[in-house]
């Protein structure tokens, strides 16, 4: 298949929009079913993730049955009861008020697994860092998540589950690792910011605090005041619609620059 080497401006903006507007969704699910053709597109996008040694270690268990969802919800309740005991006082009250899953509300639940034996005992590129197959499967999850956002479908990752018990519920072999349990469905709206940020659990860290030049500790924020390396030129010309090179800024650049400024305050 022949591919174009360049994205159009509209295509490029769409990619960044999907990234910036991706949300971990636990509420606002609609009963509207996800068509099989759309679900196949999402899974194909996931399947086109990069993987160590082209191992493609992922499998996808698509769950629609309400009885299965109810059983998984019970696993969540059990695990969440134990998890909530870790937090006391105001933090505990805040935790107990969070909605951390949409298992029964979402039309589709999706279990993403990693077959760590796929490709044999010697997978190209995995001999030193064995966990690269798990990292590869995470790339598949992110591909699906961004494609889902482009389709108007919300995705929520349910991380508070006992994976060994989950494997018994949906028949995953012992030799296969459960990596993610996701809730998928069309939603009435996507929130403007992550739920945990809205609830006051945590804030987004300014990216400049996380970027080190050449060696650990040499942070760009020490040199560049606002702490967002990706949008330095936009800040310099803010309000004039041009970036550092003089090129007219696109809407996604203006939006993401605004996000950066809000997070850095």
Where is each model-derived feature located?
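Small-aliphatic-rich amphipathic alpha-helix that forms the alpha element of a beta-alpha
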Residues: 42-47, 110, 119-169
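A glycine-rich helix N-cap at a beta->alpha junction
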Residues: 80-88, 172-195
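C-terminal helix-cap and adjacent tail motif
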Residues: 2-11, 18, 25, 181-225
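Glycine-rich phosphate/pyrophosphate-binding beta-alpha loops
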Residues: 48-53
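Phosphate/pyrophosphate-binding loop motifs in nucleotide- or prenyl diphosphate-using proteins
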Residues: 227-265
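A short N-terminal beta-strand-loop micro-motif at the entrance of redox/enzyme domains
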Residues: 25-41
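Generic structural concept
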Residues: 43, 66, 261-265
